[in-house]
Design a protein with these regions (language model features):
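Extended, compositionally biased eukaryotic interaction scaffolds
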Residues: 4, 16-19
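Compositionally biased alpha-helical segments
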Residues: 21-136
Length: 136
């Protein structure tokens, strides 16, 4: 009986030890690597402007948005400005201005995350904290 109790204790300890690691994802202080180099200027809701390169949305180099009930993806190279509005539920209103001059109202997930490099460190910001993104 004593051996059984020791065995059970060892199994429980082993389970706790294997569960102590992190859940993966990006290491702290890094940004997702992308094939395309995108430059952007992010303005947060407090008015702070941050110029970035290697810009991405959830590690992708395109805007992943909803247009009505449909899904729309627009490469960042075609965008001039994103103006983010208020969140309703899990979505945020976003006004998109393309470099061609076309303006449209879309929605994005408010939990979306934007990444970029400042040249002196990694920059990460949640969509709900962004007021505007300009693409030079």
């Amino acid at each position: 009986m004593k051996r059984f109790a020791v065995l059970v204790l060892m199994v429980v300890v082993a389970l706790f030890c294997t569960g102590m690691g992190d859940l993966g994802g990006q290491p702290e202080g890094t940004i997702p690597e992308t094939d395309v180099r995108i430059e952007a200027k992010v303005v947060d809701r407090t008015g702070v402007e941050t110029s970035l390169n290697q810009f991405s949305m959830d590690g992708k180099t395109y805007l992943d948005a909803l247009r009505g009930s449909g899904q729309l993806t627009i490469p960042f190279q075609q965008l001039a400005t994103l103006s983010l509005g208020k969140a309703t539920g899990d979505e945020m209103a976003v006004q998109v201005k393309l470099k061609s001059g076309v303006v449209m109202d879309l929605a994005i997930r408010k939990r979306a995350v934007f990444y970029g490099s400042t040249g002196y460190g990694a920059f990460v910001i949640k969509a709900r904290d962004v007021a505007r993104i300009d693409f030079p």
